[in-house]
């Protein structure tokens, strides 16, 4: 394995130049660098891929809330066991945007051009991730079919300040025996461009939460990967003045073929135990509903019954009943939900229709 990795690393270091650009501004942020820069393999069976290097997300002064770049990943992922993404946000002397901002990382589907959210996080108040040696960690193995070869990534932060946030992102690609050699992923729903571009909660809306999914006939395992975070302080409050959807604890349900099958508990995560505990004077310690400032937003995995293989079944994402009385703004749930199909034979992506 060591010889294989040395050969692969040498090939990647000979790759050309990539660029990072801001996509919300006419003034691009350009960064010339090697596609794979300064490989750091923590173990013999791990390859480290450097991607964004001190790129800034900001607003105003010709700056952009997002940055894009093209990077070279290993072409063959059949022996990749796991892929971990690490997001470092440095904020020396509290010089960054001091608020807890919604942020995420995307990979572009090379065929369709659609951006897939591979990880979401909420920035800490006032500080960066310096207390975590490698920053925030997110398992992105489910997207390994897209994290191969020349790969486009995007990082976004819902900041409204010119001082913004600065990021470096790298990936540990761990080789070994995967559970299945092949996998494919496709979004079921993505209402996640920002905290307030999510699904309105407690009022009528036109966003589709019902879909039909068809799994390939050679699927050996399939599951849903869902990321959810709520925003807003809408009333009526729950006990303890918990407004929706940032603070109100709720249970969401996924119905498969019209039967309530999976539940997502949006409750306390223990925000006060966050190792990034230097966020004062920010209000970081109280528990939100399913997320915390300065942490990655959890991904929720729901394994589908094997009897669904090769068939078309219905999917519906359902909220707990509650009505916004309109006296304190709106409530939103930013949601992305993907279906992943795995097999030991080459597999195509599941098909999702309305």
UniProtKB/Swiss-Prot annotation:
Name the reaction it catalyses.
Answer: Hydrolysis of an N(4)-(acetyl-beta-D-glucosaminyl)asparagine residue in which the glucosamine residue may be further glycosylated, to yield a (substituted) N-acetyl-beta-D-glucosaminylamine and a peptide containing an aspartate residue
Please list which residues make up the signal peptide: 1-40
Q: Which UniProt keywords apply?
A: Disulfide bond, Hydrolase, Signal
How would you summarize this protein's biotechnological applications? Widely used for the removal of N-glycans from glycoproteinss and glycopeptides in laboratory.
Disulfide bonds, which pairs? 91-96, 244-248, 271-292
Question: What's the effect of swapping residue 100 to N?
Answer: Complete loss of activity
Q: What class of enzyme is it?
A: hydrolase
* One of the Pfam families matching this protein, by short name: N-glycanase_C
Coiled-coil features, chain-numbered ranges: none
UniProt xrefs under InterPro entries: Cu2_ascorb_mOase-like_C, N-glycanase, PHM/PNGase_F_dom_sf, PngaseF_C
The enzyme's E.C. designation: 3.5.1.52
- The highest taxon in the source lineage is Bacteria
Which sites are catalytic? 100, 158, 246
- GO molecular function term, any single one: oxidoreductase activity, acting on paired donors, with incorporation or reduction of molecular oxygen, reduced ascorbate as one donor, and incorporation of one atom of oxygen
Record's subunit section: Monomer.
PANTHER family assigned to the protein according to its UniProt record, in alphabetical order: SI:DKEY-256H2.1
Q: What else is known?
A: PNGase F binds primarily to the polypeptide chain around the glycosamine junction including the inner di-N-acetylchitobiose core on the carbohydrate moiety.
Q: What is this protein called?
A: Peptide-N(4)-(N-acetyl-beta-D-glucosaminyl)asparagine amidase F
The organism encoding this protein is Elizabethkingia miricola (Chryseobacterium miricola)
Q: Which gene encodes it?
A: ngl
């Amino acid at each position: 394995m060591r010889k294989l990795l040395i050969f692969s690393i040498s090939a990647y270091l000979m790759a050309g130049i990539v660029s990072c650009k801001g996509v919300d501004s006419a003034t691009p942020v350009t960064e010339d660098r090697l596609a794979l820069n300064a490989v750091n393999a923590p173990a013999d069976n791990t390859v480290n891929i450097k991607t964004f290097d001190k790129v800034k997300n900001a607003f105003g002064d010709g700056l952009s809330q997002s940055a894009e770049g093209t990077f070279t990943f290993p072409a063959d992922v059949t022996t990749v066991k796991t892929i971990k993404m690490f997001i470092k946000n440095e904020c020396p002397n509290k010089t960054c945007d001091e608020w807890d901002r919604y942020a995420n990382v995307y990979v572009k589907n090379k065929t369709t051009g659609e951006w897939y959210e591979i990880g979401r996080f909420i920035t800490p108040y006032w500080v960066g991730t310096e207390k975590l040696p490698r920053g925030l960690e997110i398992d992105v193995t489910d997207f390994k079919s897209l994290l191969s070869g020349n790969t486009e990534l995007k990082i976004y932060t819902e900041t409204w300040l010119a001082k913004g946030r600065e990021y470096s992102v790298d990936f540990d690609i761990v080789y070994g025996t995967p559970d299945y050699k092949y996998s494919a992923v496709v979004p079921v729903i993505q209402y996640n461009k920002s905290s307030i571009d999510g699904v309105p909660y407690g009022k009528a809306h036109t966003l589709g939460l019902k879909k039909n999914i068809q799994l390939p006939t050679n699927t050996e395992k399939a599951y849903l990967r869902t990321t959810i975070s709520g925003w807003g302080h809408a009333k009526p409050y729950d006990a303890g003045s918990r407004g929706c959807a940032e603070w109100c604890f709720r249970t969401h349900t996924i119905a498969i073929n019209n039967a309530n099958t999976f539940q997502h508990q949006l409750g306390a995560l223990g925000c006060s135990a966050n190792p990034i505990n230097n966020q004062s004077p920010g209000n970081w310690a109280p528990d939100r509903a399913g997320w915390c400032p300065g942490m990655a937003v959890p991904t929720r995995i729901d394994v589908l019954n094997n009897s669904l293989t090769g068939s078309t079944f219905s999917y519906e994402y359902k909220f707990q009943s509650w009505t916004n009385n309109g006296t304190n703004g709106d409530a939103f749930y930013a949601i992305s939900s993907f279906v992943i199909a795995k097999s030991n034979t080459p597999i195509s992506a599941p098909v999702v229709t309305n």
